[in-house]
Amino acid sequence: MIWHVQNENFILDSTRIFMKAFHLLLFHGSFIFPECILIFGLILLLMIDSTSDQKDIPWLYFISSTSLVISITALLFRWREEPMISFSGNFQTNNFNEIFQFLILLCSTLCIPLSVEYIECTEMAITEFLLFVLTATLGGMFLCGANDLITIFVAPECFSLCSYLLSGYTKRDVRSNEATTKYLLMGGASSSILVHGFSWLYGSSGGEIELQEIVNGLINTQMYNSPGISIALIFITVGIGFKLSPAPSHQWTPDVYEGSPTPVVAFLSVTSKVAASASATRIFDIPFYFSSNEWHLHLEILAILSMILGNLIAITQTSMKRMLAYSSIGQIGYVIIGIIVGDSNDGYASMITYMLFYISMNLGTFARIVSFGLRTGTDNIRDYAGLYTKDPFLALSLALCLLSLGGLPPLAGFFGKLHLFWCGWQAGLYFLVSIGLLTSVVSIYYYLKIIKLLMTGRNQEITPHVRNYRRSPLRSNNSIELSMIVCVIASTIPGISMNPIIAIAQDTLF
């Protein structure tokens, strides 16, 4: 009898929870329709994996890619709509947030075809890999629209947990296990630091958690210039710094890049920076509105350290992935210039444009590294010597992406950096822009050093890895070629396309 009553109570409680969830989706689902599509795709992946055999593997890729493409389409259809706040103020939808969500979806859409051949050759578990990628994408999208401190903490944790699992996906690899352990420990420490900063912000504002209400609370309590806000700013800057990985919060980056599977590195190298940049712009610009000079100084220090250390240490690297890790540290220094400039002088517009180009340049480079690594089993920069003699298409496409990363004209990277530096110069960041220009010249050196190796034709310099190089017989090679071609074309867009891209980005400002 007791069991029967408990069972009825359980059914009633479950029904209430289901009805409440249905009510939320019914009245708020339109605000998170792209996210709902990804959730539906995740459910389909689980259902197919639990009810089918290995012959349905192409369906897993198809469902993942289709859900991402439909989410992008839903975002584009919602473009230019009025800003909306939903879920009791926890989530905000506007053009500024949506363009960052678009960039995250674009990264994931390009990373899935880039991963197909790698997964087939290494016999990795496919379903779990796709589930983690989609869930991380979902966490990044929620972070872009987060409007309160709780959501800003929970959303990146969703992204981070999937990132830890992806980085340690090849559990038999000692380097992967070591990288995951460092990533997990430093990620947990940074989350604790971030929450501690939030607690100071929460207390100083009189118990408010919504971003705009925090500003109102600071005005009401007259605490906007208090030491507590300075303490909160320091802790939050350190916490967000781990996600952006500028120096000196970069220690995890080279090890994770080197030890993780290459498609995972490609995914994390762009999505984490896009999501963290979206979060940083909102946190610094809204709750710390009265401390703008203080957080500008903090970010300027991070940008200078990142540009100098990242590009100088990249010169000494012998591993291709570690070189790109330090290169990404330098690249985030350029992005921080746009965050500092902010809403004035098109700072956000230039930052968004450069991040779009950075996605194409970086993913195009990693697509070539995946192809070369699967055929040779090496990641050493010297082993790329003479690749042009065996695979001219791979060598030329890699060279174009590297030149674009270095910022040589007339490639997209040059015009992206030019507009970003010009906005910083107009905002009076003369020293910061000068450091950016000098370190860009340094980055060109180590990129050209790799290109020289690629194009060398002397037999004594060609390594055995290149001599034994063979093209892949797998049909899945077409998917990585497609992803690479898209990235290379986007990386070589001439400057004539800058004006419409900048114009679209300007429409995303607050």
Curated annotation (Swiss-Prot):
The keyword Isomerase does not apply. One of its GO terms (cellular component) is chloroplast thylakoid membrane. It catalyses: a plastoquinone + NADH + (n+1) H(+)(in) = a plastoquinol + NAD(+) + n H(+)(out); a plastoquinone + NADPH + (n+1) H(+)(in) = a plastoquinol + NADP(+) + n H(+)(out). InterPro entries: NADH-Q_OxRdtase_suN/2 (IPR010096), ND/Mrp_TM (IPR001750), Ndh2_N (IPR045693). GO terms for biological process: ATP synthesis coupled electron transport; photosynthesis, light reaction. The keyword Plastid applies. The chain crosses the membrane at residues 24-44, 57-77, 99-119, 124-144, 149-169, 183-203, 227-247, 295-315, 323-343, 347-367, 395-415, 418-438, 484-504. One of its GO terms (molecular function) is NADH dehydrogenase (ubiquinone) activity. It holds the Pfam family Proton_antipo_M. Its EC number is 7.1.1.-. Signal peptide: none annotated. Keywords: Chloroplast, Membrane, NAD, NADP, Plastid, Plastoquinone, Quinone, Thylakoid, Translocase, Transmembrane, Transmembrane helix, Transport. It is a multi-pass membrane protein. It is found in: Plastid, Chloroplast thylakoid membrane. It is an enzyme of class 7 (translocase). Belongs to the complex I subunit 2 family. NDH shuttles electrons from NAD(P)H:plastoquinone, via FMN and iron-sulfur (Fe-S) centers, to quinones in the photosynthetic chain and possibly in a chloroplast respiratory chain. The immediate electron acceptor for the enzyme in this species is believed to be plastoquinone. Couples the redox reaction to proton translocation, and thus conserves the redox energy in a proton gradient. NDH is composed of at least 16 different subunits, 5 of which are encoded in the nucleus. This is NAD(P)H-quinone oxidoreductase subunit 2 A, chloroplastic. It comes from Buxus microphylla.
